[in-house]
Amino acid sequence: MSAIAPGLVLLAYLCGSISSAILVCRLAGLPDPRDSGSGNPGATNVLRIGGKGAAVAVLIFDVLKGMLPVWGAWALGLTPFWLGLVAIAACVGHIWPVFFHFRGGKGVATAFGAIAPIGLDLTGVMAGTWLLTILLSGYSSLGAIVSALIAPFYVWWFKPQYTFPVSMLSCLILLRHHDNIQRLWRRQESKIWTREKKKKTPEQK
């Protein structure tokens, strides 16, 4: 199986390079997410500029393009080392997509999809951590950052053989969020439901 492993890594990168945020926005007649809102082609920004339906479509597709390559590689019997490279390649494709001039997103949903095949128990605690952080803080970026920081410890607890590749994924996610970390520190980061609150304010007055 090691002979086909590099090909699967390349395939994962190409899958990751399919930017669902850009494609969904084009199909829905919405602005290019790279030039609107936060400038990030991801589900959160699509939520801001296009609403829940478009955002859900982007989220599902981004998760699947991380999940399916890893599941396929696992079904073919690749070792944890190669599975980790497949997962990282899918996220690298999302972040630096060859089909869209290497201007991609943060890789959070794709990384979650890539980790999901490890097990439902891990998937559950990861999703719970992400959702709870967002509900308590209102910051989508903080949910991603906290989840990325804790993910290696969760994986070490459930499936320790995958700790190293997941740690690499977490480092990649944190590096992509360096601007968000600075804005959070300065209290300049936008909350995920700021737009809805602004819409309600004139009516309340």
UniProtKB/Swiss-Prot annotation:
It is found in: Cell inner membrane. GO terms for biological process: phospholipid biosynthetic process. Catalyzes the transfer of an acyl group from acyl-phosphate (acyl-PO(4)) to glycerol-3-phosphate (G3P) to form lysophosphatidic acid (LPA). This enzyme utilizes acyl-phosphate as fatty acyl donor, but not acyl-CoA or acyl-ACP. HAMAP family: PlsY. It catalyses: an acyl phosphate + sn-glycerol 3-phosphate = a 1-acyl-sn-glycero-3-phosphate + phosphate. Its EC number is 2.3.1.275. This is Glycerol-3-phosphate acyltransferase. Pathway: Lipid metabolism; phospholipid metabolism. Keywords: Cell inner membrane, Cell membrane, Lipid biosynthesis, Lipid metabolism, Membrane, Phospholipid biosynthesis, Phospholipid metabolism, Transferase, Transmembrane, Transmembrane helix. One of its GO terms (cellular component) is plasma membrane.
